[in-house]
């Protein structure tokens, strides 16, 4: 397997040069209105719309859209992106950018550049096709965009499968395209109609997959085109929702011609007119493209870094932010979404605020939360409240938006309360939902979805440490807003919990913290059956501050001995070899996969943050590089990981060693952002400003970070000189705190 491609010079795009890869190289394009398309390096992919109530309309699945060209003189048909026809094109490249995907190739002297983007507004995607004739004779080409759709997501019977059909696909002159209209009452006025339109003359069209595709009607074999036929210009009232256009163009030698197409969903033809208005001119299309890029660029510019590691620069400046935004649209779960928002606080505080509101609206009056809201999962996971507290405090530090605490948000089970009340109810739930050791109950599971202890009184050391961290954060917040008595109460509770954890959760023989208790037995201790140590109690002991000074090096040593591997940090060690119903799903997973003894990147991300919190940037950097895709220990040839996004896990099972799990959908993205900006560079959020305490890797002698906050640009320059100092706009500081400013620009110079 060859090298699949390379980053652009500024890191905002990845150029794929290998047509066939271990897994499809996907890009994700989306907008605030809920439109989302996931594109492969072939220009194919899935598209969907998520509505405000979280219902999702699946427009089409992977394999549901294609672009074909046919040389009308030779009859040759091909796909410029290779798939779905497996076309033998030359000079193939795919540029996955932040906001677009462009596929380029050449076939028999005809080069094609095929760009897809999602405008900043509207439920639509735009395809731009540029064709250049490199031959010395004129040619005539048919350009055929084709979509085989689902348009499903509503609840109720699928009316289009009934004898009385409930939709029709027609060609509408005023749209210059095909229009799919549903009369299904279950759509409830939501945009389940669709339109596919062209910028220029449409010579033929089709609304019938049976007339265009050979059985079983896949886009792999466009029967009509391959047999010299044109599209049948038919109306369809049966079969699968389908739309195709055929536009014929004559191109002289050396000439380039352009066509634009738009695919979108709507409620009616009036809305369809607005969707296709983007095609009024090439200038209009490019204006929409620039608007989309400008919105993305604004997000990118709010936090920018420059370090000696280009790959880390690319990830922090572009790909982590993009990944977290995508995950917020793709996932709907308390823990997951709050951690994505955690990583976006500096670059998109308004998104973090909206996510907090949404999560709180799925919190019960007693303080606990649902696991996810789409689909709704009310299974009792114990860690929900701690993410609400940690992320809200993080947001308040950065924004100083204390009025947010007074805002009222509904509870999931009725009634409403202020944001502050929601925080306090979450803390109260964790403080009172305790087991025999006065530790937090594990309930069905905590952060580790697969650790399902069957004892109703089972306790989670992880959640208990998380509660300790929350108590610290709440104490600082209460002090900041003048509620000193509550601040003192939370401080006292923190100290009491710290003592409880250190008395009950320390494994004297192994010299590390255990994972929990169930049926009177220790989980994750030296005497435990199956797995004897877990990563999270060691890392969260540091993150929460509960580890005592004399135990810090001991847990570091234990982690190095059992948890740290060439691939990253194991969730647990050793992996459970046999199924243990009392332990749960984790023991049913094959050893060395997912949560059972694999390298779970989220757990490694906790580890690197714990390392930088201890001031050990070098150790954190070493571990971070392991979970970065295409690393020295897991190069692309081994892992198959997408080079521009983090993955969920790496297998340690000998049969699939180093292979990856799912790309994009991992909570480790927010924690990597935090590690680099607040750890390596040391620019930590605080009430009223930043604390600056860098912990750069040993071979980083200089780094920069630019942060835009409320109209002020903060420029941090960190240099390794052997002398510690901080100057703000040339004035030497006696402390490491940099206050927020209303100036246009603040320059902070740090030496270490």
Which residues are covered by each model-predicted region?
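Aromatic-lined, polymer-binding surfaces characteristic
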Residues: 302-305, 309-318, 322-337, 359-386, ...
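Anionic coordination/interaction segments
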Residues: 1-335, 350-358, 362, 394-398, ...
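Catalytic cores of carbohydrate-active enzymes
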Residues: 144-146, 161, 370, 466-583, ...
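Beta-rich accessory regions
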Residues: 120-147, 189-190, 199-209, 252, ...
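Secondary-structure capping and boundary motifs in well-ordered enzyme cores
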Residues: 118-123, 253, 330-336, 348-351, ...
């Amino acid at each position: 397997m060859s090298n699949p491609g390379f980053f652009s010079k500024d890191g905002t795009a990845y150029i794929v040069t290998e047509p066939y890869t271990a897994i499809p190289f996907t890009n994700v394009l989306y907008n605030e209105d809920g439109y989302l398309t996931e594109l492969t390096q072939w220009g194919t992919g899935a598209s969907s719309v998520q509505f405000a109530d979280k219902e999702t309309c699946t427009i089409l699945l992977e394999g549901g859209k294609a672009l074909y060209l046919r040389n009308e003189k030779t009859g040759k048909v091909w796909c410029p992106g290779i798939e779905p026809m497996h076309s033998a094109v030359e000079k193939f490249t795919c540029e996955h950018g932040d906001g677009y995907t462009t596929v380029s190739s050449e076939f028999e002297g005809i080069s094609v550049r095929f760009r897809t983007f999602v405008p900043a507004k509207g439920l639509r995607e735009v395809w731009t096709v540029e064709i250049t004739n490199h031959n010395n004779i004129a040619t005539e080409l048919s350009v055929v965009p084709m979509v085989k759709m689902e348009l499903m997501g509503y609840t109720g019977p699928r009316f289009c499968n009934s004898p009385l059909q409930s939709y029709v696909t027609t060609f509408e002159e005023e749209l210059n395209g095909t229009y799919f209209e549903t009369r299904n009452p279950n759509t409830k006025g939501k945009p389940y109609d669709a339109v596919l339109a062209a910028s220029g003359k449409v010579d033929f069209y089709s609304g019938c997959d049976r007339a265009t595709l050979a059985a079983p009607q896949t886009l792999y074999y466009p029967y009509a085109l391959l047999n010299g036929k044109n599209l049948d210009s038919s109306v369809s009232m049966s079969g699968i929702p389908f739309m195709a256009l055929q536009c014929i163009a004559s191109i002289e030698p050396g000439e380039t011609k352009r066509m634009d197409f738009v695919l979108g969903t709507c409620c009616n033809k009036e809305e369809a007119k607005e969707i296709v208005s983007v095609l009024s001119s090439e200038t209009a299309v490019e204006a929409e493209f620039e608007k989309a890029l400008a919105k993305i660029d604004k997000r990118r510019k709010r936090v920018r870094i420059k370090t000696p590691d280009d790959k880390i620069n690319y990830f922090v400046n572009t790909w982590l932010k993009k990944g977290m935004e995508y995950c917020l649209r793709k996932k709907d779960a308390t823990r997951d979404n709050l951690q994505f928002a955690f990583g976006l606080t500096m670059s998109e505080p308004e998104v973090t605020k909206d996510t907090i509101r949404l999560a709180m609206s799925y919190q019960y009056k007693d303080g606990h939360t649902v696991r996810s809201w789409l689909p709704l999962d009310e299974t009792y996971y114990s860690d929900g409240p701690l993410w609400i507290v940690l992320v809200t405090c993080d947001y308040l530090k950065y924004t100083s938006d204390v009025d947010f605490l007074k805002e009222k948000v509904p509870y999931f089970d009725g009634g409403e309360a202020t944001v502050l009340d929601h925080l306090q109810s979450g803390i109260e739930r964790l403080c009172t939902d305790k087991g025999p050791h006065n530790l937090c109950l594990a309930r069905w599971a905590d952060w580790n979805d697969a650790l399902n202890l069957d004892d109703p009184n089972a306790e989670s050391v992880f959640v208990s440490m998380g509660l300790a961290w929350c108590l610290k954060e709440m104490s600082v917040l209460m002090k900041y807003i003048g509620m000193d008595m509550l601040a003192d109460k939370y401080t006292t509770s923190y100290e009491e919990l710290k003592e409880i954890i250190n008395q009950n959760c320390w494994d004297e023989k192994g010299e590390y913290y255990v994972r929990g208790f169930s049926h009177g037995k220790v989980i994750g201790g030296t005497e435990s059956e199956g797995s004897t140590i877990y990563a999270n109690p060691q890392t969260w002991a540091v993150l929460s501050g509960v580890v005592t000074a004399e135990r810090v090096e001991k847990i570091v040593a234990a982690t190095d001995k059992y948890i740290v591997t060439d691939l990253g940090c194991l969730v647990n060690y050793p992996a459970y070899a046999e199924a243990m119903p009392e332990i749960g799903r984790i023991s049913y997973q094959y050893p060395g996969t997912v949560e059972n003894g694999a390298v779970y990147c989220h757990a490694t991300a906790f580890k690197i943050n714990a390392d930088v919190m201890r001031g050990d940037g070098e150790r954190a950097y070493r571990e971070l590089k392991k979970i970065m895709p295409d690393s020295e220990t897991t190069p692309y040839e081994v892992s198959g990981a997408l080079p521009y996004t983090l993955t969920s896990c790496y297998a340690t099972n000998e049969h699939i060693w180093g292979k990856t799990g799912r790309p994009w959908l991992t909570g480790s993205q927010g924690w990597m952002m935090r590690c680099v900006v607040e750890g390596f560079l040391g620019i930590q959020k605080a009430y009223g400003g930043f604390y600056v305490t860098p912990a750069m890797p040993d071979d980083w002698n200089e780094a920069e970070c630019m942060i835009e906050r409320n109209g002020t640009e903060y420029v941090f320059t960190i240099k390794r000189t052997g002398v510690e100092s901080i100057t703000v706009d040339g004035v030497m500081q006696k402390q490491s705190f940099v206050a927020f400013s209303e100036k246009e620009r603040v320059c902070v110079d740090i030496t270490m």
